[in-house]
């Protein structure tokens, strides 16, 4: 009997069937079947996706033996087939793995699942003014989790089921819990330790949005680029750092400008990590999206000397409360399609300017390429301001397939925001005196 959970996985396109041909050794005499299969997932701007299947063979397969048309994946589009020396998305001329790469544009590839406490109808939040009326510290009856990707692979008349999942970058984070004696809270978190820890390095704190509230420790890693991007090998080669991504199981900030006790617990956790690792206390950076951005703003207000700089994405706060952060280094990012963050950031930056803060502003396009962002960044930062405020112009954060209803403009802001390298550069150029 098919369980509801298995049904959800099936309709979400998680369980896929891969048909592989019989691969023949170069000598043309030995037909062999794959011995093992591994699902490969990757976190993109809109979440973790099943991106490929690595099929292991008992000999080094050469690229000349492979053809895209020889492979098919039920419900998916095969974009590339190539040999590899290790499980991942790095091709090689030959190797013991055949990587069946899948198209990013395929529909229904999300691994996210809603988790309900009791009846799903009872889990709907109370609404006020057309939006959820959440309260800081509140446990949600509807949370999320991310399922493990699986694939059923057919080759030579036999069937293999993936025996493991290789999560690119996300697997390099360690999971732990911190029991805070001062607040009485226990906080789950993900922690990335850089390869070279001989000298003190910066730490980046990323805090997720309310929609990622979950009991699953890794949910914040899988939701988008906010935590993952800093641990990307290419990023670490340029800007090595520690990365802290707490996983909150309750609402951490609300629209009445209250925060959960997790705010203090997170600060206490960072202080603990500084004591235990070679972390530069003058280069602690905060970033967050939506509710995480709100909490980061509240941290800047309550602990104005704690962070070297902050990247605040698609959040809001009361302009009447931001005076204590007037000396801080902040990059604000919102979209004109975000009916909450855009007016709030406008009010906040105007209030800070009244206090003498130099803020440089620009309207950017969410569809720009790497070179366009670089040019716009160079132009804006030439003004050498204390704070920067960039806004994605109307309709520019949406892809052709994106809905424009509800909070889509809000969510699509952070899908793009963390992919802009020059802003990450700016953050790391800041240091407390």
Q: Which residues are covered by each model-predicted region?
A:
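A domain-start/cap signature at the N-terminus of enzymes
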Residues: 27-52, 75-201
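Active-site machinery of serine-nucleophile hydrolases
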Residues: 210-264
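C-terminal catalytic histidine-bearing segment of alpha/beta-hydrolase fold enzymes
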Residues: 336-340, 358-433
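Gly/Ser-rich "nucleophile elbow"/oxyanion-hole loop immediately N-terminal to the catalytic nucleophile
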Residues: 254-289
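Primarily recognizes the serine-hydrolase "nucleophile elbow" in alpha/beta-hydrolase
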Residues: 282-325
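Short beta-strand element of the alpha/beta-hydrolase
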Residues: 200-209
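Short beta-strand/loop motif that positions the catalytic acidic residue
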Residues: 332-334
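N-terminal secretory signal peptides and thylakoid transit peptides that target proteins
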Residues: 1-15
């Amino acid at each position: 009997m098919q369980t509801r959970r298995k049904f959800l996985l099936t309709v979400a396109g998680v369980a896929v069937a891969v048909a592989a041909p019989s691969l023949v050794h170069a000598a043309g005499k030995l037909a062999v079947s794959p011995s093992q299969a591994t699902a490969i997932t990757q976190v993109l701007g809109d979440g973790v996706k099943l991106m490929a299947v690595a099929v292991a063979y008992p000999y080094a397969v050469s690229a000349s033996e492979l053809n895209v048309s020889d492979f098919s994946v039920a419900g998916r589009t095969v974009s590339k087939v190539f040999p590899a020396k290790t499980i991942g998305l790095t091709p090689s001329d030959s190797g013991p793995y055949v990587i069946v790469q899948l198209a990013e544009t395929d529909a229904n590839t999300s691994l996210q699942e809603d988790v309900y406490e009791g009846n799903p109808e009872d889990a709907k939040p109370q609404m006020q003014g057309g939006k959820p009326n959440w309260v800081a510290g509140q446990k949600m009856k509807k949370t999320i989790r991310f399922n493990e990707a699986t694939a059923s692979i057919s080759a030579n008349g036999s069937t293999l089921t993936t025996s493991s999942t290789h999560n690119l970058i996300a697997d390099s984070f360690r999971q732990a819990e911190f029991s805070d004696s001062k607040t009485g809270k226990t906080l789950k978190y993900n922690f990335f330790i850089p390869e070279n820890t001989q000298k003190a390095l910066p730490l980046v704190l990323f805090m997720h949005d309310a929609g990622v509230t979950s009991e699953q420790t890794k949910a914040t890693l899988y939701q988008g680029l906010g935590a993952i991007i800093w641990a990307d090998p290419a990023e670490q080669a340029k800007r090595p750092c520690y990365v802290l991504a707490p996983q909150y199981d309750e609402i951490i900030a609300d629209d009445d400008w209250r925060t959960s006790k997790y705010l203090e617990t997170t600060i206490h956790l960072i202080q603990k990590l500084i004591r235990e690792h070679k972390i530069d206390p003058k280069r602690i950076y905060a970033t967050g999206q939506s509710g995480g951005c709100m909490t980061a703003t509240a941290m800047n207000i309550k602990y104005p000397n704690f962070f070297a700089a902050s990247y605040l994405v698609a959040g809001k706060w009361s302009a009447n409360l931001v005076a204590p952060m007037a000396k801080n280094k902040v990059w604000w990012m919102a979209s004109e399609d975000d009916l909450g963050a855009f007016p709030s950031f406008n009010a906040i930056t105007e209030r800070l300017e009244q206090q003498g803060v130099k803020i440089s502003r620009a309207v950017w396009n969410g569809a720009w390429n790497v070179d366009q962002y670089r040019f716009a960044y160079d132009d804006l930062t030439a003004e050498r301001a204390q704070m920067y405020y960039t806004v994605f112009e109307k309709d520019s954060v949406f892809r052709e397939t994106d809905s424009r209803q509800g909070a889509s403009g809000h969510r699509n802001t952070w899908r793009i925001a963390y992919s802009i390298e020059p802003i990450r550069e700016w953050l790391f150029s800041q240091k407390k005196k």
